[in-house]
C-alpha cells in the first residue's frame, strides 16, 4: 500500500548559514558599530542572540528572520523566549521547533479524516504516517496539508508506492 510520512524538520546546515550571514551583517552595519552583539547556536535546539540593549535585540531578530527566510527556513518553526537582562547585557533565545507536536499531529489527523479521503493516518512519535490504497488519494492529502494553516511547517518524506 502506498504511504508517506508527514514530518517537521529543519535543515540545520541552512540555519547555520543564516546565523553566519546574520553575524557578518551585524559586524558591518553602522548602527552596530562599537556594540558587542552576536548570534550563537546552542545544542542544535536554539539560537541565542546577545547584545547590549533590548532595542538592538529587536533589530537582531529582524536580521535573523530575514536571513532564515532567505535560506528557505519557515518562520513558523521559531519560538522566541523572553528577553533576559543582566550584567549590562541583554540576551534572547529563539527555539527551533522540530518534530510534530502531539496536539498538531492530532489536528492533522482530524483534518485528514474530515476531508473524507480514503486514507488512514497514524501518529508515530514525532511524525505522522499516512497510508492509502491509491496514490491519488495520498496526493490529495498532500495538497490539503500544503494549503492548510498549520502551526508548524510540514514536509513529506518516505513516499512509498
From Swiss-Prot:
Domain of life: Bacteria
Entry coiled-coil feature ranges: none
Cellular component, GO, one term: cytosol
SUPFAM superfamilies in UniProt: YajQ-like (SSF89963)
Transmembrane domains' residue ranges: none
UniProtKB keywords: Nucleotide-binding
Keyword Nucleotide-binding: yes
Record GO terms (molecular function): nucleotide binding
Its job: Nucleotide-binding protein.
Similarity remark: Belongs to the YajQ family.
Protein name: Nucleotide-binding protein Mmwyl1_2033
Species in which this protein is naturally found: Marinomonas sp. (strain MWYL1)
Organism lineage: Bacteria, Pseudomonadati, Pseudomonadota, Gammaproteobacteria, Oceanospirillales
Amino acid at each position: 500500500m502506498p504511504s508517506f510520512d508527514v514530518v517537521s524538520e529543519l535543515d540545520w546546515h541552512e540555519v547555520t548559514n543564516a546565523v553566519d550571514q546574520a553575524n557578518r551583517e551585524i559586524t558591518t552595519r553602522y548602527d552596530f558599530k562599537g556594540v558587542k552583539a552576536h548570534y550563537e547556536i546552542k545544542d542544535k535546539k536554539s539560537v541565542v542572540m546577545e547584545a547590549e540593549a533590548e532595542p538592538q535585540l529587536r533589530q537582531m531578530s529582524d536580521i535573523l528572520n530575514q536571513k532564515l527566510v532567505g535560506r528557505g527556513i519557515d518562520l513558523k518553526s521559531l519560538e522566541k523566549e523572553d528577553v533576559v537582562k543582566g550584567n549590562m547585557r541583554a540576551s534572547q533565545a529563539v527555539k527551533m521547533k522540530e518534530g510534530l507536536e502531539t496536539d498538531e499531529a492530532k489536528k492533522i489527523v482530524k483534518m485528514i479524516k474530515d476531508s473524507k479521503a480514503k486514507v488512514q493516518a497514524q501518529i508515530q512519535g514525532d511524525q505522522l504516517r499516512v497510508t492509502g490504497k491509491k496514490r491519488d488519494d495520498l496526493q490529495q492529502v498532500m495538497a490539503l496539508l500544503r494549503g492548510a494553516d498549520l502551526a508548524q511547517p510540514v514536509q513529506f518524506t518516505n513516499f512509498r508506492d
